[in-house]
């Protein structure tokens, strides 16, 4: 990214990564095509959301990043330029810890990459939970309304105040929800 290269040598490019399968394409592209040309030391990676599972669980957003990208890029180091949401911790405690971490490390995200679920959710904020978008803290605990899986989710303020907020939408399975948002005016977390 040109913006990352344009920053002074000590400035970092802070990216918040979406979860689910959305960023897999990006991770594979980086690992296979740009692993040796990306200035990794200039990037700091944070997460938009995480399921409350350990990183070894297939459902872990950080776990996917680790397997698909960071395991093959030695410059990506947890605690240095990779800051995961600790999914195996209590969601309430982790939302507080991660909120404080982000407040202390990131004035403003350079880029927030969001996905969209087939139901219109983003950042583990589901339809009917739109009030969580206006929570005062950067991260909050959330719960999937059907599976009851606990999660930690970024709220609306960091998304809206990022220098760039990108919805990365892949696959024909997303066409219906995109059509409903754009053409039918569906009100859901992703449309706000």
Can you say where each PLM-predicted feature lies in the sequence?
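A short secondary-structure junction signal
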Residues: 95-96, 123-128, 177-181
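Ligand-binding beta-strand-loop-alpha-helix segment within the catalytic cores
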Residues: 38-113
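ATP/nucleoside-binding phosphotransfer catalytic cores, i.e., glycine-rich phosphate-binding loops
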Residues: 157, 163-192
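N-terminal glycine-/serine-/threonine-rich phosphate-binding loop
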Residues: 1-15, 92
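Class I SAM-dependent methyltransferase SAM-binding "motif I" and its flanking Rossmann-like core
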Residues: 111-157
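A glycine- and small-aliphatic-rich helix-loop capping segment at beta-alpha/alpha-beta transitions
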Residues: 29-39, 63, 67, 127-136, ...
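Glycine-rich beta-strand-to-loop/alpha-helix junction loops that act as flexible
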Residues: 17-22, 114-118, 170
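Glycine-rich N-terminal segment of FAD-binding domains in flavoprotein oxidoreductases
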Residues: 9-34
């Amino acid at each position: 990214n040109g913006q990352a290269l344009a920053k002074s040598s000590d400035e970092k490019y802070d990216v918040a990564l979406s979860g689910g399968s959305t960023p897999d394409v990006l991770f594979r592209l980086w690992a296979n095509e740009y692993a040796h040309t990306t200035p990794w030391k200039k990037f700091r990676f944070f997460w938009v959301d995480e399921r409350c599972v350990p990183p070894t669980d297939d459902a872990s957003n950080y776990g996917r990043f680790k397997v698909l990208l960071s395991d093959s890029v030695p410059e990506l180091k947890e605690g240095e330029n990779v800051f995961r949401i600790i999914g195996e911790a209590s969601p309430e405690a982790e939302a507080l810890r991660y909120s404080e971490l982000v407040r202390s490390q990131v004035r403003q995200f350079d880029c927030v990459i969001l996905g969209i679920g087939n139901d219109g959710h983003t950042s583990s904020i589901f339809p009917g939970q739109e009030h969580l978008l206006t929570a005062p803290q950067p991260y909050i605990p959330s719960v999937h309304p059907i599976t009851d899986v606990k999660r930690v989710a970024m709220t609306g303020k960091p998304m809206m105040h990022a220098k760039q907020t990108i919805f990365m939408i892949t696959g024909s399975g997303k066409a219906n929800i995109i059509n409903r948002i754009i053409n039918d005016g569906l009100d859901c977390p992703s449309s706000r």
